[in-house]
């Protein structure tokens, strides 16, 4: 270290706004805030309050202004940047439109998402996060096999590269198509950015520091290509109204960028790009004008209310729609046509009621006087607090509910061709009992008994063939044993709705006494009804005006071929009476009922095994799954989990359960991504209407950050 004078040394700092490098004489015990104060020219009338020191070589912000240079580790050979904390980020919304937004690059990613959602009028921002856009190359190899790119940083003498911290997601995109730090976002001759399809507006010069939060008179102006820019002349109302309605289809170049997985392996590799919520986005290789995707990350949506969540519901509907069109989820043919019909109804209602005319929410109470408004508000409050069935007569609460009927049963066995056998089923207290006859159920012991608590439930329904089957993967009675597979077949849809609802509740550890049983039955009936052949005449529409590729996945397009439009219009007759908001809500509910909904996949290797397997992470459990078939080998519930932690040195994760410990390494993503998913879902489970308080950001980071 070269010292100049008494315990002083030279520190080089680049003021990025002015592109001027200054050399200050400092001491090691000088505070960071004092260094910034010495940088500012008092004669220059500029607001520097949004600026902070960034250390490119270490890839960290020096935001603790009371810390000294010695405490921060800054030495004479260090080179710092004095740069704005708020920078422009291009954000792709779930409906695939882009907006340019001023984000605090020094705040934790979680805080940046919360701030963005607040401006966009999206409640419960903890359900969303940023992820880096992917390209086809990312699906060809596991994360562990991808070239381990370091984060490029600008130094005085050129570009340097730093290794991401061990306890963060170290994924850096292979190419520079979305990342500006390697020069890929240099402006073109017409001033447009190259990080995404060029937008027709000309980018303005850098605006004064500040965010839409601090500028309540700002607006976002949209154009036909799906881009939005910030203009400080009016309010956010136009933006929120626009985000509550989405165009029918994105531009062709945006759609062409979509990455379509072709197997379970590729679906698992889709999850490599999630940002670390505990670090700032700049510390994760994201630079100004780069693109990030805003997506619903945790598939547990709290208190969806059409009255308050128009933007949230629309963006959720759009994410659901694209997950189906992009073949991330694969519904049956009947389910696909139901989704297409609901989407067609959404588009039809949007054409009938453009933004600003009708929101799709029932406002009839406004016409009937103030007393009805009060009654309506009280009823809504009661439903919110008690649930949909709260006001109904629940009967004798001391009697344990029971379900019984004749059904067919099958336990698949290797090398046998045995078919279904008829039994008299009774279900009570999470236990399924099978008898040879109803008379035997009154006096004899059951022939077969199955504990359904924590089972995996998969529907197998074909309305055209009259097939109503339920596949159950039941936890083994042997300690640490694999799941066993059994099938239950119902005679009709009414029987199926009751038993399927019971099985779904059992999977969550809930019995028939749970207040949500009736609503679960009603939801299943409603979904089946929408998949039936329509009774009424289809809407009079010119088939040539319907573009089937906007409603069907490529695989289903090939299957239906020339009959696609006709089948969509026939299915639409079932849902043609739905309002805009009802159609979106039905779509979301149907999406949530799909077998693979809400299961985030990762490729892993268990400790001591060379074989790759799938790990599924859901809102209440993690699952060991077969890589080829997707069968559930073993399920572990979060309520049996004592601790989970990561060895950051070898990127290995250990989960301590009541009966066993499991250790695995993650192949398809960084270990931090899995760690954060588990902690995030546990955080989501702590929410309740009785405890509907301010978002506890500290608790979120404690559960997801990998440190206490």
From Swiss-Prot:
InterPro entries, A to Z: Band_41_domain, FERM/acyl-CoA-bd_prot_sf, FERM_2, FERM_central, Kindlin/fermitin, Kindlin_2_N, PH-like_dom_sf, PH_domain
GO annotation terms (biological process): cardiac muscle tissue development; cell-matrix adhesion; defense response to Gram-negative bacterium; integrin-mediated signaling pathway
Location(s), subcellular: Cytoplasm
Phosphothreonine, modified sites: 211
Primary location class: cytoplasm
Domain FERM: 274-602
GO terms for cellular component: cell-substrate junction; cytoplasm
In-chain residues carrying the UniProt-annotated modification Phosphoserine: 181, 184, 199, 215, 234
Assigned keywords, A-Z: Cell adhesion, Cytoplasm, Phosphoprotein
Domain PH: 400-508
Domain of life: Eukaryota
Gene Ontology MF terms: cell adhesion molecule binding; integrin binding
Record function comment: Probably involved in cell adhesion.
Domain notes: The FERM domain is not correctly detected by PROSITE or Pfam techniques because it contains the insertion of a PH domain.
Family per similarity comment: Belongs to the kindlin family.
Protein name (record): Unc-112-related protein
UniProt organism field: Drosophila melanogaster
């Amino acid at each position: 270290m070269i010292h100049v004078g008494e315990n002083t040394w030279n520190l080089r700092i680049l003021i990025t706004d002015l592109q001027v490098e200054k050399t200050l004489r400092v001491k090691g015990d000088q505070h960071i805030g004092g260094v910034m104060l010495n940088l500012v020219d008092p004669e220059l009338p500029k607001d520097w309050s949004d600026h902070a020191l960034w250390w490119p070589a270490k890839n960290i912000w020096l935001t603790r202004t009371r810390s000294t240079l010695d405490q921060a580790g800054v030495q004479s050979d260090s080179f710092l940047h004095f740069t704005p904390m708020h920078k422009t980020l291009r954000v792709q919304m779930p409906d695939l439109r882009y907006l340019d937004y001023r984000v605090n690059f020094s705040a934790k990613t979680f805080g940046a998402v919360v701030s963005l959602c607040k401006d966009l009028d999206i409640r419960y921002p903890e359900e969303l996060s940023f992820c880096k856009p992917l390209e086809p190359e990312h699906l060809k190899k596991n994360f562990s096999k991808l070239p381990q790119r370091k984060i490029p940083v600008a130094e005085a003498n050129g570009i340097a590269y730093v290794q991401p911290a061990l306890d963060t997601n170290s994924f850096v995109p292979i190419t520079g198509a979305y990342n500006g730090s390697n020069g890929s976002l240099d402006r073109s001759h017409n001033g447009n950015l190259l990080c995404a399809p060029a937008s027709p507006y000309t980018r303005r010069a850098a605006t004064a520091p500040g965010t839409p939060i601090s500028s309540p008179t700002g607006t976002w102006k949209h154009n036909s290509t799906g881009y939005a820019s910030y203009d400080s002349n009016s309010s956010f109302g136009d933006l929120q109204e626009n985000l509550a309605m989405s165009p029918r289809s994105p531009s062709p170049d945006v759609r062409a960028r979509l990455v379509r997985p072709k197997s379970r392996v590729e679906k698992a590799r889709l999850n490599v790009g999630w940002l670390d919520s505990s670090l700032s986005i700049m510390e994760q290789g994201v630079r100004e004008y780069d693109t990030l995707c805003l997506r619903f990350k945790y598939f547990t949506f709290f208190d969806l209310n059409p009255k308050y969540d128009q933007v949230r519901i629309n963006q959720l509907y759009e994410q659901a729609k694209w997950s189906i069109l992009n073949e991330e989820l694969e519904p049956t043919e009947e389910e696909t046509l139901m989704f297409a019909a609901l989407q067609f109804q959404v588009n039809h209602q949007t054409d009938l009621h453009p933004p600003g005319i009708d929101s799709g929410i029932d406002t009839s109470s406004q016409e009937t006087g103030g007393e009805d408004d009060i009654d309506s508000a009280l009823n809504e409050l009661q439903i919110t607090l008690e649930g949909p069935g709260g006001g109904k007569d629940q009967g004798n609460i001391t009697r344990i509910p029971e379900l019984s009927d004749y059904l067919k049963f099958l336990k698949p066995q290797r090398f046998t061709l045995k078919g279904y056998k008829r039994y008299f089923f009774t279900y009570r207290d999470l236990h399924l009992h099978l008898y040879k006859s109803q008379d035997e159920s009154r006096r004899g012991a059951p022939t077969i008994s199955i504990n359904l608590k924590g089972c995996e439930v998969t529907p197998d329904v074909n309305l055209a063939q009259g097939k109503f089957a339920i596949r159950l993967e039941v936890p083994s009675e042997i300690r640490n044993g694999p799941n066993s597979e059994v099938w239950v077949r119902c005679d009709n849809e009414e029987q199926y709705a009751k038993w399927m609802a019971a099985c779904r509740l059992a999977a969550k550890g809930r019995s028939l006494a749970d207040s949500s049983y009736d609503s679960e039955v009603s939801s299943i009936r409603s979904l089946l009804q929408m998949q039936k052949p329509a009774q009424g005449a289809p809407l009079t529409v010119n088939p040539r005006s319907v573009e089937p590729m906007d409603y069907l996945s490529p695989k289903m397009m090939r299957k239906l071929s020339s009959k696609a439009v006709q089948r969509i219009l026939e299915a639409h007759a079932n849902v043609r009476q739905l309002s805009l908001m009802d159609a979106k809500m039905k779509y979301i509910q149907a999406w949530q009922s799909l077998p693979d909904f809400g299961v985030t996949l990762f490729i892993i290797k268990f400790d001591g095994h060379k074989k790759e397997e799938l790990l599924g992470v859901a809102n209440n459990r993690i699952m060991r799954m077969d890589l080829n078939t997707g069968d559930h080998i073993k399920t572990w519930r979060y309520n049996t989990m004592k601790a989970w932690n990561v060895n950051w040195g070898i990127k290995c994760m250990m989960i301590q359960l009541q009966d066993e410990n499991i250790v695995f390494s993650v192949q398809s993503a960084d270990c931090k991504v899995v760690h954060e998913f588990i902690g995030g879902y546990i955080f989501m489970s702590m929410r309740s209407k009785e405890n509907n308080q301010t978002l506890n950001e500290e608790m979120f980071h404690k559960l997801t950050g990998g440190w206490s």
